[in-house]
Design a protein with these regions (language model features):
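Active-site-proximal beta-strands of protease catalytic cores
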Residues: 2, 24-27, 87-98, 112, ...
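Structural motif
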Residues: 15, 22, 84, 90, ...
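A conserved glycine-rich beta-strand in the N-terminal activation segment of trypsin-fold
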Residues: 2-22, 48-54, 76-79, 105-106, ...
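PDZ/PDZ-like groove recognition
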Residues: 191, 195-263, 278-296
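Active-site region of chymotrypsin-like
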Residues: 70-78, 109-178, 207, 215, ...
Length: 296
């Protein structure tokens, strides 16, 4: 994927979702060109030509985007797997266009799961985007790989390559691979992509609170302590108050704010969920209906 605007240009990668031209990539690859730039897609294969594409939807919250090629094309969709059963040590392959070198394949393993990392923003002034629940891999990922596929040994896409950690780099500048790359799990990416194709935007379940991580130093209970509960929010309607410490969402333990976000993302807006929390050292539960973060 080649992107160009009046102020910048760059390259990225993508994953074909549907034969009629829908392609999944990263928000930070195409966001700046969504309104005033151009997006050109090049396909690897005999007889394929470069074609222009348009943005279907952007989701900065998860750093995902969907574009659609113009005209009539019959594309071969990628085979999407599941990220739910991944295990550290599983072999993986990263596919993309690092440094503009299309069709590059690198191999490695899953080094870790459930990482929280930050990726470069689409503009110099925007804050970096946090990725929650990311897959860490030592398969070489470099600038230009963003939006490309991380596949398992059977060739099924299990992640969308999105970020790297590099020596001498900050969240806004990246150097080369040192074997620490990160991908968005395909289960999350698939859900967001379906929403973007259907409505052009994505929703994100939320409680309507601000919180901080407590107990990480071994002192006191571990969890996400509420600092603010917005009036009329899902949390407020369920009786939650500032000072409450959320320790579970459903049956899953929560030991940090990041963990709370990860667990909430397993649900959809409108779902009913049970939250376990501590108030004055007493364990309580509350049933609430998740709201869209945009309205929180």
């Amino acid at each position: 994927i080649q992107v160009e605007s009046t102020t910048s240009k760059g390259t990225g990668s993508g994953v074909v979702l549907r034969s009629d031209g829908y392609i999944l990539t990263n928000n930070h690859v195409v966001a700046e060109e969504a309104t005033s730039g151009t997006i050109t897609v090049s396909f690897n294969g005999v007889g394929e030509v470069d074609t222009r594409a348009d943005v279907v939807g952007l989701d900065p919250e998860t750093d995902l985007a969907v574009i659609k090629v113009r005209g009539k094309h019959v594309l071969t969709p990628a085979s999407l797997g599941s990220s739910g059963g991944l295990v550290v040590g599983d072999p993986v392959v990263a596919i993309g266009s690092p440094l503009g070198l299309a069709g590059t394949v690198t191999s490695g393993i899953i080094s870790a799961l459930n990482r929280t990392v930050r990726v470069p923003s689409e503009t110099a002034t925007a804050d970096p985007t946090p990725l929650f629940n990311a897959i860490q891999t030592d398969a070489a990922i470099n600038p230009g790989n963003s939006g490309g596929a991380l596949v398992d040994a059977a060739g099924r896409v299990i992640g969308i390559n999105s970020a790297i950690a590099s020596l001498g780099a900050t969240v806004d500048t990246q150097s080369g691979s040192i074997g620490v790359g990160f991908a968005i799990p395909i289960d999350e990416a698939r859900s967001i992509a379906e929403q973007l194709i259907r409505t052009g935007k994505a929703t994100h379940p939320a409680l309507g609170v601000s919180a901080v991580t407590v107990g990480a130093d071994g002192v006191g209970a571990r969890g996400a302590q509420l600092k603010e509960v917005q009036p009329g929010s899902a949390a407020a309607k369920a009786g939650l108050r500032p000072g409450d410490i959320i320790t579970k969402v459903g049956s899953k333990p929560v030991d940090s704010v990041e963990g709370l976000i990860v667990e909430l993302r397993r649900y959809a807006v409108g779902d009913s969920v049970t939250v376990t929390y501590l108030r004055a050292k007493a364990t309580r539960t509350a049933r609430l209906v998740l709201q869209d973060k945009a309205s929180a």
